[in-house]
């Protein structure tokens, strides 16, 4: 049975490649999806790759992933909640309430940036937190999920 990895991207990540390239790099979200597709293929995993600027959509997708988790068909979720990392109790409750294995991911090193980015509501509920590896962090997170 092939397990699935969900890669969920939050607000403004659709602007990758043009938004603050000195912070986030020049690769686009389509480039990130290709990177994730290749990483999943190396491990024989299926990929669901999504982006939304809306908090509720991210919550719904975590709930969707939890159904695969309950059926033993989920490797895990890579969650780049972007700004919602620092504000969303709803995402925290979704992760805690479903028990899905989550890797919290940030392209930049959030701890080297503005102080408001240093706090994560999600970190305590995530299995792992990755930041500062650029978009390559997505592939590293998938590699980690494949080992669990």
From Swiss-Prot:
What Enzyme Commission number(s) apply to this enzyme?
4.2.1.10
| Keyword Amino-acid biosynthesis in annotation | yes
Q: Which GO terms describe its biological process?
A: amino acid biosynthetic process; aromatic amino acid family biosynthetic process; chorismate biosynthetic process; quinate catabolic process
Please give the catalytic activity noted in the UniProt record: 3-dehydroquinate = 3-dehydroshikimate + H2O
Name the residues annotated as site: Transition state stabilizer: 19
Q: Which InterPro entries is this protein grouped with?
A: DHquinase_II (IPR001874), DHquinase_II_CS (IPR018509), DHquinase_II_sf (IPR036441)
Which top EC class is given?
Answer: lyase
Transport among keywords? no
> Which amino acid positions bind substrate, per UniProt?
80, 86, 93, 107-108, 117
**Catalytic residues, chain numbering:** 24, 106
Q: Pfam families recorded for this chain?
A: DHquinase_II
Q: Which NCBIfam families match?
A: aroQ, PRK05395.1-2, PRK05395.1-3, PRK05395.1-4
Q: What is this protein called?
A: 3-dehydroquinate dehydratase
Question: Taxonomy-wise, where does this protein's organism fall, top ranks first?
Answer: Bacteria, Pseudomonadati, Pseudomonadota, Betaproteobacteria, Burkholderiales
Name of the gene this protein is made from: aroQ
């Amino acid at each position: 049975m092939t397990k699935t990895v969900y890669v969920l991207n939050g607000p403004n990540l659709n602007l990758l490649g043009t938004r603050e390239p000195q912070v986030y790099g020049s690769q686009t979200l389509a480039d990130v999806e290709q990177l994730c597709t290749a990483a999943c293929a190396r491990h024989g995993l299926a990929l669901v790759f999504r982006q939304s600027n809306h908090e509720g959509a991210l919550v719904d997708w975590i709930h969707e992933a939890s159904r695969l988790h309950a059926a033993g068909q989920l490797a895990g979720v890579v969650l780049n909640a972007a700004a919602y990392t620092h504000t969303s109790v709803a995402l925290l409750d979704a992760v805690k309430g479903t028990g899905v294995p989550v890797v919290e991911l940030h392209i930049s090193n959030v701890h080297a940036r503005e102080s408001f980015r240093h706090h994560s509501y999600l970190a305590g509920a995530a299995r792992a937190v990755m930041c500062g590896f650029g978009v390559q962090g997505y592939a590293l997170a998938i590699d980690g999920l494949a080992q669990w």
